């Protein structure tokens, strides 16, 4: 009887935590613009500056379009230079040894939507881990698990905005949320990694959504 009761308690706690994780994710989507508006988003142009290391600072533009097209451009010595992208077939990234854009056959493009848009249909399991503090802000900590991959998300417990995302080899901090159309988007993104070799701070001053890009914008 005790064993049966323990199994029931464990099963119920797993169910309730999954429900809680779902509620947190649903609340984030709702308060950041709503699922319909996120699904109506077809393209994004991010503009601002990126700070690399202590002093290196460059103007940056990031073009993104469904389903997974992307292009990142830095302005270096008054010249626009593509440093990374995906044209729908091939991936490209800057080879800093040769200072040339190089094709990468093993390039894995990221989905246009983040993982917690339609996470259930994508095969993820959501787990509510508990509350943790980021700075002075209490956050809901949620894990999204698929096969051996696990990402961790921290949502502000008051606003439900995403403040931190921990991937396998990168941590992203999001802040300075502003309305862009009907959507709430972060205008400050900070990336850090265990190796500290690709850390950056991106400060955006303009985000445009659903622009029609020129046909050649994703050609490299």
Where are these regions (language model features)?
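Flexible, processing/modification-adjacent segments and terminal tails
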Residues: 19-24, 30, 37, 85-152, ...
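Well-ordered beta-strand positions in beta-sheet-rich domains
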Residues: 57-61, 81-83, 101, 152, ...
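Residue-level detector of beta-strand face positions
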Residues: 45-49, 73, 92, 131, ...
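Gly/Pro-enriched, hydrophobic low-complexity segments
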Residues: 138-219
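Bacterial Sec-dependent N-terminal signal peptides
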Residues: 1-21
């Amino acid at each position: 009887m005790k064993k049966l009761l323990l199994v029931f308690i464990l099963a119920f706690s797993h169910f309730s935590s999954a429900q809680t994780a779902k509620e947190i994710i649903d609340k984030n989507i709702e308060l950041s613009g709503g699922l319909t508006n996120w699904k109506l988003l077809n393209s994004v142009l991010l503009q601002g500056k990126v700070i690399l290391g202590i002093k290196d600072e460059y103007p940056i533009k990031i073009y993104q379009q469904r389903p997974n097209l992307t292009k990142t451009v830095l302005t270096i010595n008054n010249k626009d230079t593509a440093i990374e992208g995906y044209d729908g077939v091939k991936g490209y990234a800057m080879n800093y040894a040769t200072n040339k854009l190089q094709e990468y056959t093993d390039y894995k493009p990221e989905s246009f939507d983040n993982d917690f848009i339609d996470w259930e249909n994508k095969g993820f399991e959501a787990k509510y881990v508990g509350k943790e503090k980021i700075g002075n802000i209490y956050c809901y900590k949620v894990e999204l698990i698929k096969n051996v991959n696990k990402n961790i998300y921290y949502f502000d417990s008051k606003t439900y905005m995403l403040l931190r995302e921990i991937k396998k080899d990168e941590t992203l901090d999001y802040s300075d949320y502003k309305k862009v159309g009907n959507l709430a988007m972060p205008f400050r993104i900070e990336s850090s990694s265990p190796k500290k070799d690709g850390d950056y701070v991106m400060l955006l001053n303009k985000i445009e959504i659903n622009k029609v890009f020129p046909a050649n914008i994703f050609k490299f």
